[in-house]
Amino acid sequence: MESLSKVAVIGMGKIGTVLATNLVKSNHAVIIADRTPDKAEALAKSLGKLATPRDVVAAIKEADLVILSVWFETIKEFFKKYSVELQGKIIIDPSNPLALAEGGGFKKIIDQDQSAGQLLSALLPKGARLVKAFTSLSAESLSNKAFQQPERAVMFYASDDIGLKDQIEPLIRAVGFEPLRLNGISQSIRIETFGDLAEYGGLGKTVTLAEARAKL
């Protein structure tokens, strides 16, 4: 088993719950937090001793990698509220800039040529570094397509800091996927919903490593 930095998952919605659950399935410890503490405590109880509930401040302080699994529209305020705690942290952003559309489905809430990753990278607290990951697949696929055999499904990620590879790729493998890095946060738009490398976009499905590389 690869060594893994201390991980906190903040936000116990569908994505956050799946990521925390998958980490425990891989026998990795995870810190979990939610603005509603009872949700984090209930999930930790169901996952067992590898999951530790904390309040948001404590979760950030204790972790090296912070998976911020909250709605895109709330992240700017989150950065402001926890700017001191987030200094120097590695922040993993799985958000998609979406809202419910009239008649069903989702619509993009930023300009078509913008990405959540690029917008958030300009708002980072001092010394924090951003990685865009876990955004190209639905919560259902993050659960059902994890740990596939004999070949794992790919999880794309984007970051301007290639030096984060040794921390991010073990995390992605621990969640049950094969990591594949894109060239910087500017590529976030490709892996966010409607992007050409997204399940709900150009790909229409999960892909193997060979299939993914053919799309780059």
Segments (PLM) and residue ranges:
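Rossmann-fold NAD(P)-binding glycine/threonine-rich loop
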Residues: 95-140, 144-146
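Phosphate-coordination loops involved in phosphoryl transfer and adenosine-cofactor binding
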Residues: 3-6, 88, 152
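General beta-strand structural signal in soluble alpha/beta enzymes
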Residues: 53, 92, 129-133, 180-184
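Active-site-lining helix/loop region of Rossmann-like oxidoreductase modules
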Residues: 152-216
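Short, conserved loop/helix-junction motifs that constitute active-site signature segments
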Residues: 82-88, 123-125, 148-149
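NAD(P)+-binding Rossmann beta1-loop-alpha1 motif at the extreme N-terminus of oxidoreductases
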Residues: 1-49
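Rossmann-like NAD(P)-binding element
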Residues: 48-51, 56-90, 94-104
